[in-house]
Amino acid sequence: MVILVGGTNGLMALKVAKISGLPLCYSHVDRYPDGEKYFRFASNIDGEDVVIFNSMHPNPDEIIFETLLIAETAYSNGARSVTCVFPYFAYARSLDTVKGEALPIKTVVKVLKAAGVKKIITVDFHLQENVFGVEHVDLTGMEKLAEYCLEEFSDSFTVLAPDEKAAFWAEKFAAKANCDVVALRKIRIDAENVIIDDLRTGVEGDVVIVDDIVSTGGTVCQAARIAKRAGARRVFVACTHAILARDAMMRILESGIEDIVSTDTILSPVSHVSVADVIASALS
């Protein structure tokens, strides 16, 4: 088995290779003057199980195409199998659509299967189910995030899930931290705006808002204000994937949130927790 580093989050791929002891597969990636992508394996992969390592942020469309190009080329050069590690997997917002609306995850799944991908490894996949039609291993960063929060934020807190879906991850986090969980109910208005119901019970002491993704920050900011109104002393945020789109970081800090931490599935200023060892264990 060899690891091929894609166009994003090469640092984590290098960590995984070092921890697992798996060799790196070298390649040459370039771009023609007209914008077309060039790819070539610089290592012999004949008979190898190739692990393509790519995180789908930023520019998920670019990463998806690059992954397809690499997978196809791997088989053309004698690879025995192709596994894709996507620490962050984009286009997984929902399986629900209205008439005339695209369902991108369906298209992404089709093209990955067509390219011969045999196994997909993700971390805290948003849809919480296997939609790929191939072997899917979904890992979690919640236990490591809980450990970090206990050491760096507070030794006692209540976990707050900002919506019903986030309760799935909040429960994992709370199990490790040995603390209570409270879940809010959210109604999404559009891509950036949500309405969240108030807490029906008060909270005391510190609160950690737990979710898989923080993108614009709208959800966690509203949840933080609700927690404060309910009696929280300090509010922190822990997430697996910190996209932090546009002015999200400023919005979060201005909302009264003390601090935010994420894993390194997406590199950001708050990526203080590494899940490289979790991924390395899944590859061993």
Swiss-Prot record:
The active site is at K186. Keywords: ATP-binding, Cytoplasm, Kinase, Magnesium, Metal-binding, Nucleotide biosynthesis, Nucleotide-binding, Transferase. Binds 2 Mg(2+) ions per subunit. D-ribose 5-phosphate binds at R188, D211, S215, T216, G217, G218, T219. Pfam families: Pribosyl_synth, Pribosyltran_N. Its cofactor is Mg(2+). It catalyses: D-ribose 5-phosphate + ATP = 5-phospho-alpha-D-ribose 1-diphosphate + AMP + H(+). This is Ribose-phosphate pyrophosphokinase 1. It comes from Archaeoglobus fulgidus (strain ATCC 49558 / DSM 4304 / JCM 9628 / NBRC 100126 / VC-16).
